[in-house]
Amino acid sequence: MRRTLSAALVVAIPMLGTAGAATLIERLVVFGDSLSDVGNVEVLSAGLLPPDPYFDGRYSNGPLWIDGLAEGLGLASARVPVLEGGTNFAFAGATVVPGGADTPPVPTLQAQAEAYRLSRLFTGIDPNTLIAVWGGANDVRSALATHRTDPAAAEARVRAAADGVGGIVRDLIDAGGDRFLLVNQPDIGALPAVRAQGEQAVEEARSLTGLFNEAFAQQLATLDEDTAAELITLDAFELFEQLSDPGTVPSFDNTTDPCVAGSTMCADPDEHLFWDEAHPTARAHAVGAEEALDALRSANPHPVALASPAGAVPSAVTSAVAEPA
């Protein structure tokens, strides 16, 4: 039986802090890595990264999940990099916490959030702001690189990253933040870049992903007990597990190989789950956007500031999610 992704997916991680009355979402602020970067690294590198055939400063072949979410909320500033005056602070390559010498010279998620917090120092964070936080994949991949030689240090690095997300949210709550969209990690072992390292690497990466997600869930549970903030969650691990299942609608013919490999590009990116060795295609991102919008609607069944009529998913998202002809 073919299964269709639905809003039920978002309850795979418990929905937290949703008892309060619904309020309008008037702005969207984003912290993250290449899965959410809409052009900050492109600006930082004077247009050198990402190279062609990547789309408009994004590490994919088209709009990212955050583009679809921002469109659905009618909040265009989240589709503009902070380096160009927008509210998207995500940088490709970013880790949650500072790493070793292999860490790219871009702001960590902690630094991104601190920059935003300082910018709101005198005014506070408007309670109608939705803050999206998705990071940790690069911390897990960095830990994987040292796991065989020093597993204890690698696991400590992963826990520190998950704890770092919790610290970011707590600091932003203290600054006035009241509504958050928080995303865990998909199976890092499923990335083509990790598959290429062999089965042991795949198993280690999956284990480290599980460690991160467990610590991440513990952080959210503590925040839910200690604060009154609305913590809306999206289970990226379960989402990618379902997208990798050929019985799921929408389906992808190829869920293991990248569309782009060196100078070679596949004939139809929409049939691939992965655009390159580490990033999803635009079609996969569109599914994520739809699920994020459904998560917001599930948390707030009363009207929130959705741009689309009757809470419909934007056409740009639905067209990408639809089964290819």
Where are these regions (language model features)?
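Gram-negative bacterial Sec-dependent N-terminal signal peptides
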Residues: 2-20
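Conserved active-site regions of diverse hydrolases
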Residues: 19-320, 325
